[in-house]
Amino acid sequence: MTSEADVFVDLPDGRTVPVGHLSVRASEAGMLVSSQFQYTADYLRDPARYSLCPELPLVQGPITATGHRPIAGCFSDSGPDRWGRNLLFAAERRAAKAQGRPLAHMTDLDFIIMVHDETRQGALRYSIDGGPEFVSPARDQVPSLVDLPELVAAARRHAQHRETDTDLDLLTRAGTSMGGARPKTTVRTPDGRLAIAKLPAADDQWNVLAWEATTLELARRAGVAVPAFTLHPITPDSAVLVSDRFDRDANGARIGYLSGHTLVEKIPDGIASYTDLVEVVADHSEDPDADSREMFRRVALTLLVNNVDDHMKNHGVLRGSTGWRLSPVFDVNPFPARWPVDSTPLSHDGDTAGRDIGQLLDLSGHFGMDRASAVTIVAEVERATASWADVAADFGIEPGEVEFMSSAFESENRSIARNLTTTVRIDTSLGGADRCQARTPTRPCPAHQGMPTGPGT
């Protein structure tokens, strides 16, 4: 078990500097008990310094984490989530068997440092034992878009516990630090940029990633910041969604990233609401007014497409020169409204299964705007997303599946929002509601063949 590491950060000014030392204490079974982090004196004197996350203020001396959060969220955000951990554990299990040794008890820090440095999420980097290189070094090149069918097949075999050594090598080489439970990898685009390839899961009941592409395009039309993305059909009813990594700039430089889960310092099984999230984002934002309004627009979108997988890890911020800004939206998926599903409440005492867009309007003050401005935004988002069925068809979704998903879009919340359009002047310039920039390689939007993908990040 690894018990300590030196931590580095790529600063917005382009320098990579030592930031501090991290040590962890774990039980015999590998369960993390506590951790301790201490900033270096040089970092605390650096004019470009910033607190890595709310749990780690810029102070001298050790900062201890224990109890329900035994390691600071910024470190967790740079490591693997459920999908990545499953891959790394499978690789360790296979290595232990091949070497005839007991299975190692891996701590959170072990998982963090096992991630390949090249594809690690955010701007943090690690070294161990005073070594000169960052861990973990990549053994092979990051896969490219031509490897997508092979990645899909390997992920499917892994889900069925039939993966080979070659499968595990490919999937771990493709990166394990992206969050979430769904299969996903890092790939390199033809122009050399890193991108996320979200893969179909073996138990998908509909074309999940085509619907995510649909929702991203609707978000763009509604004026929400989205990453550039393309949809790559694999079979008639499944596809891979490839989107640019927004924690890298156009030159490949790293950009600091924190999840909403880290920002709100959410405890296990605790409930964080959108009013909690917008408050903490505004506290740390370079432009709190703009980010608060953007958050309101995203919540309106969430309610109008019934995106229920909107937990705090599916929100994030990126480091700027003097503070943080909301990242482009990600992991937005419609869900059939045929049964109630718990999701992020609008306010601390709000309903988790029956979120009401009328209540969102009542909460407009928490997002830094008056009710009239909030009504305008809701009406704009409703108009921009009203053509959801046509956009879904553009992405190759079959008519029967469009009908199946209609309850996600044609809801009581949409009826309420649609009534607002009769009294509000709509800004039709948002995101180009008559344009379809995001496309699939084989199914470009009919009127705009050859257009570039959606806006970059």
Regions flagged by a language model, labelled:
Residues 431-443:
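Short Cys/His-rich zinc-binding micro-motifs
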Residues 444-457:
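Long, low-complexity, intrinsically disordered segments
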Residues 1-312, 316-430, 455-457:
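Phosphate/dinucleotide-binding and metal-coordinating scaffold of catalytic cores
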